[in-house]
């Protein structure tokens, strides 16, 4: 009870004097030597305490006290507090977290706060989660400015923090997120350095998710402990967006969708990368070159005649997915086949139809790439259209992939299925064990 009393006085400071008088009166009436738990108090006293809390509703408080007394309340490990409704589900989280002596560990808490609140009210809600060893917290603030709840700086159980549609003007120098491993920022705005400021709060940060950089500034992502990075920075409407500078040597997993220029530094620990960019990265020589260590690469990008420096090798690359919507896809594929000697699986896919034709007819290399003659086993071609450039490329692969085991093709134009697939089956193929599959 001492902890509860301290919590109420601290997080609802305006009612401190009233709480003190109530607790003193309770102890005199009950003639108790030590304070009891809140759940051991009379219903009318519990109701009076609840009446001083933020978000109080008389009918819901009465109903909850009755249900709790009958043993009908069961804690929800995934709590949602939505101030648009403030129904029994919302208030059960508040009242139950205060009443229960050993409330169940909270797997997640989702706060949807549309109205304006002072910082202490938000801190009150978050502290309820902290007291229940909260693992994940999501705050949707609907465009308002958020002062980070100070109680988070002492929370050692929080693993995932999601901030959605809010503004952060400043982060106190003393503030920390000691146990947060995953930080997700969705439509968050703030000062010029708000992203680096938030990143620095996480001492064990392993995963970062950023959905739209609305600050129009270059965001430097430089986190020694970061293992996974996901960025969705595609323009939606006319909202101006900024760009990123990715400098994370320890990064193992990268997922990025970007319509703006991104600067890539070396990522020697990379295992899997999924990259979709809508601008030509040819001026950034470190773009594809920074991905040379990856084993799984999915790439959709406009390219130039020289997509990366000569001599670049993708020795670890085993699985490659390449988009065929850009004018330079044949040139990029030819280069990567030549520079990925251990490639075993190749998938070609048309993400979005383009009216732009390849810049020029692909010139077959004089020397067969090592991966075709010794490694490639799986070929998948999604949304195959049967253009001259596609037929030219697939014909070359089938004629030189000695160990190809399966070639799978699909097309969106069902009227042309039979003719296209018949044409593919008639092509020369060097592998005697290759199986053709048409979906």
UniProtKB/Swiss-Prot annotation:
Highest taxon above the source species: Eukaryota
Gene3D superfamilies on file: Ribonuclease Inhibitor
Species whose genome carries this gene: Arabidopsis thaliana (Mouse-ear cress)
PANTHER family: F-BOX DOMAIN-CONTAINING PROTEIN, F-BOX/RNI SUPERFAMILY PROTEIN-RELATED
SUPFAM superfamilies per record: L domain-like
Record key words, sorted: Leucine-rich repeat, Repeat
Residue ranges annotated for the FBD domain, each copy included: 361-411
SMART domains: FBD (SM00579)
LRR repeat placement: 155-177, 223-246
Full protein name: F-box/FBD/LRR-repeat protein At5g56570
Domain (F-box): residue spans on this chain: 35-81
